[in-house]
Amino acid sequence: DPEYVNVGFGWRGHFDQQPPAVPTKDNHVGSYRRIIDIPANWDGKQVVVHFGSVTSNIYLYVNGKFAGYAEDSKVAAEFDITPYLKKGKNLIAFQTFRWCDGSWDEDQDFWRLSGVARESYLFARDAQLHLEDIRVTPDLVNNYKDGVLNISAKVKGTGKLNFILFDKEGKQVTTATGLAKNGTANITMNVENPHKWNAETPYLYTLQVSLSSALKNGNMKSASMTPVKVGFRKVEIKNKQFLVNGQPVLIKGANRHEMD
């Protein structure tokens, strides 16, 4: 069966296609396992395992117990494995199959390589207060002169959010704060005449997102700090013309296959 096709499925001619079923013959499996030590200072925290990219799916086991399943070859998968861990050594194992039912949706002009393609790692966070997700959407206003950051932060627990924007040289540009209560906090940051991002000068700022909670004595306890790279740009289509920051751009290109 081909590892690359630009038309049709990789199993064509060898399988009576009946979605969402996939072939059992030649549906090869990769098995991975690693013994790890959980640091002592992670005790009491939520431990999450992150897989940047696994093709085509992943069955995860921790210390012999099933801990989760995911499928989507180019989207990260994260699992809370706290309930399955013990003190000392822990066995993390997972299997990934060449095809799954999601492979029907991934029929593209692409190399069909199975396995682990991006970084995999563990991280720990406060179980009661942590940043679950963040979306930063940049925009340009005032005839593409000034910048706006529309920030949506999803938080577990109740805490204070602090946002600090730094330029490429590490100089503080602007700040904002917000209060998150078991849900989503929406913040808008305005930046006067920022460096603009484009293909020729891809200037990036760093948005530092800090989450903290108040102690009984009135002091603040830091729960997490997350850096996010952001660039100020505006992409539009006007009068059948593709524009970046108000300037027309002609795009020429082809697929980039993620092989590295």
What are the functions of these language-model segments?
Residues 60-62, 146-178, 185-187:
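Beta-strand-rich binding/interaction modules
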Residues 98-104, 213-216, 222-223:
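Short acidic/polar inter-strand loop motif in beta-rich domains
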Residues 127-157:
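Surface beta-strand/loop "capping" patches
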Residues 8-38, 42-50, 55-62, 68-71, ...:
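Active-site-adjacent substrate/metal-binding segments within catalytic domains
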Residues 42-45, 85-89, 191-204:
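Short glycine/proline/serine/threonine-rich loop/turn segments at secondary-structure transition edges
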Residues 22, 27-132, 157-158, 162, ...:
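Accessory beta-strand-rich segments of carbohydrate-active enzymes
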Residues 75-77, 182-191:
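Aromatic sugar-binding surface patches on proteins
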Residues 93-95, 206-210:
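Extracellular recognition modules
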